[in-house]
Amino acid sequence: MEPLAMTLYPLESTQPTRNKTPNETTWSSEHTDDHTYFLVSLVICSLGLAGNGLLIWFLIFCIKRKPFTIYILHLAIADFMVLLCSSIMKLVNTFHIYNMTLESYAILFMIFGYNTGLHLLTAISVERCLSVLYPIWYQCQRPKHQSAVACMLLWALSVLVSGLENFFCILEVKPQFPECRYVYIFSCILTFLVFVPLMIFSNLILFIQVCCNLKPRQPTKLYVIIMTTVILFLVFAMPMKVLLIIGYYSSSLDDSVWDSLPYLNMLSTINCSINPIVYFVVGSLRRKRSRKSLKEALQKVFEEKPVVASRENVTQFSLPS
């Protein structure tokens, strides 16, 4: 069974060599000539790069650092990486620029960014879920640098997973050995048995919290953007990974299924591009209609109000009688 490059990267670099002749690039001629697809994809990536770049700048220089904004900053960096590498790959394949080194690094860093985004979204969901289930611990016992440490560990995990996928399954350094199969199994377990279930379960709890509105002072906007971002990721970004995994284990997929891969890749770039828009729109929502600057909207949406009625109650509850 031929290894099929997994995770995010699409038809441009990872599709098996069907419809391929020495005079063609990795895409079939049908997709290479599809200038509409190329232009739309490039516009999406360009807007996403601008939006995430602006978000990164605001989070670093203009908005006070908080536990939640640390996660959002790292997520924006991961999305920026995916969009940049996707843009490079589209330009390389459209203009027939043959550069294996550039292509290899673009694939590696895009897989790296995709995996990191998945891990960070799960961490964000789990942490907010814990703030709902254990509000006193979150206010009083949560380690000060937990967000930064968690982000570093998740980046390290992504380096491991992405490096294994790239080394054994994409570059095929040792194609005569079955390591790629084990890498796929490890990646599938990590994704579909650990991170995705945690993400979904945590967001179900947040959804119940928002619907029941048991504690009015809870940062509802924060929960809304978390749930929206996760739903967008599951709808737009996950189908690519699922299809490529199925393609690795099934040699009987119809060509029409492979033809959908470039469009699934476009959906994944939409997912990376739309997050800053979600933050701004949710941050701008207000009962009183008033225009807000981008900075004010972001500050509003990233506010973390106390999750209990008052600090006195927390102190009274936590001190021995």
UniProtKB/Swiss-Prot annotation:
Q: What does this protein do?
A: Orphan receptor. May regulate nociceptor function and/or development, including the sensation or modulation of pain.
Sorted alphabetically, which PROSITE patterns does this protein's record hold?
G_PROTEIN_RECEP_F1_1, G_PROTEIN_RECEP_F1_2
Extracellular topological domain residue ranges: 1-35, 93-102, 169-188, 247
Protein family per UniProt: Belongs to the G-protein coupled receptor 1 family. Mas subfamily.
Gene Ontology cellular-component terms listed: plasma membrane
Q: Where in the cell is it found?
A: Cell membrane
Spell out the CDD domains in the cross-references. 7tmA_MrgprH
Please give one Gene Ontology molecular function term for this protein.
Answer: G protein-coupled receptor activity
Q: What is the name of this protein?
A: Mas-related G-protein coupled receptor member H
Designated gene of the protein: Mrgprh
Q: Does the keyword Cell cycle apply?
A: no
Predominant place of localization:
membrane
List where the protein spans the membrane: 36-56, 72-92, 103-126, 148-168, 189-209, 226-246, 248-271
Q: Which UniProt keywords apply?
A: Cell membrane, G-protein coupled receptor, Glycoprotein, Membrane, Receptor, Transducer, Transmembrane, Transmembrane helix
Pfam families given for it?
A: 7tm_1 (PF00001)
| Record: glycosylation sites | N23, N99
Topology in the lipid bilayer is annotated as: Multi-pass membrane protein
Cytoplasmic face: residue ranges? 57-71, 127-147, 210-225, 272-320
Is the keyword Transferase in the record?
no
**Alphabetical list of InterPro entries matching this protein:** GPCR_Rhodpsn (IPR000276), GPCR_Rhodpsn_7TM (IPR017452), MRGPCRFAMILY (IPR026234), MRGPCRH (IPR026221)
